[in-house]
Amino acid sequence: MRVGFFISSLSGGGAEKVLITIAQSMADNNIGSVSITSLEKRPQFYQVDEEKVELYKIKNKHTGIRAFWEDFISIRKHIKNDNAEVMISFLSRCNLLLLLCCLFNNRKIIVCDRNNPLKEHSRVIFWLSCLLYKRANRIVVQTNQIKTFYPRFLQKKIVVIENPIDNHKLQNELCRDGYNTKRVISMGRLEPQKDFETLIKAFAEINKQFSDWKLDIYGTGEKQEIIQKLIDDLNLTSTVCLCGRTEKPVMEMSKSDIFVLSSYYEGFPNVLCEAMYAGCACISTDCVSGPRELIEQKLNGTLVPIGDVSKMKQALLTYIKNEDIRQKNGKNAQRTVERLYVNNIMKKWRELIEQVGENK
């Protein structure tokens, strides 16, 4: 079977990483021939073994409506020349483009929404998207909570598959020479969704009592200057660092004691999964969706209300003051995410692709 993947870019991001993991795993295990088509809207960050996976890059320079039209023409031309039996699209824009291109044919399509659709779009756009999603053979979402957001007429098409952890690859990044590094770590795009401001303000309070602890934030984005100014204004330049991107996030996590996810919303937070895999004591906002399906309160991590500096500070203090709790929660977290190991998740993807390919 030939399977074609579609995505807007292969830049740094959770959806891009998941697509690469699934496509590469299929190719490595000889599950048919695999291709990836990227619209190249941002520079490529994630790499793929091009000896096993065919990589196509569609480069259109325009923005807005013109870009959408040009991408539509390019994708339509591409799929006419490609004989993929099943096409799998990631992220809303690419999903809509692929469905529009195949509106009047019988190509088999799986679309994957990777975020909270009610936060990502206006309600009008969401409902228009849902009408177009009727054309898809299957819709993949990451959590049961996200599934409930979609209308009843789509429910039979929706399949919940959590994100995989590529444990075979990531085990080489683990670097646990010892605990008590006195390092807090966070990762994500420096954009409003991630709300790093709440974390930094909470850490500013921590710093007054535990000045030997450090906070490292990995990622880039539109709010970098604003976040750096907040760090400067709070006199945290010696203890809080914006570190840019890292190609080995799990290595950095495994050299840290505490991981924090401060987001307003998520689809299914890869970075939280990876931090749990690395054995960090994890703190996350109780946002929609994902954290609540991963964290059991105070057993393998801590959930705090969104945007609550005081509760974030309290959660940090609990871990900072109690190394035994940090280690216990970190080890429990590692056991929790074993269900996400790539072989376990790939079984679900293989079954889904075979069902769609056979028209079940």
Task: Please name every model-derived segment.
Residues 13-21, 182, 189-208, 215, ...:
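A conserved mid-protein helix/loop that constitutes part of the nucleotide-sugar donor-binding site
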Residues 296-309, 318-324:
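Conserved acidic donor-binding segment of nucleotide-sugar-dependent glycosyltransferases
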Residues 5-66, 149-151:
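N-terminal strand-loop element at the rim of the active site
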Residues 89-97, 113:
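Short His-centered aromatic/hydrophobic patch
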Residues 37, 281-285:
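Short hydrophobic beta-strand element within catalytic cores of glycosyltransferases
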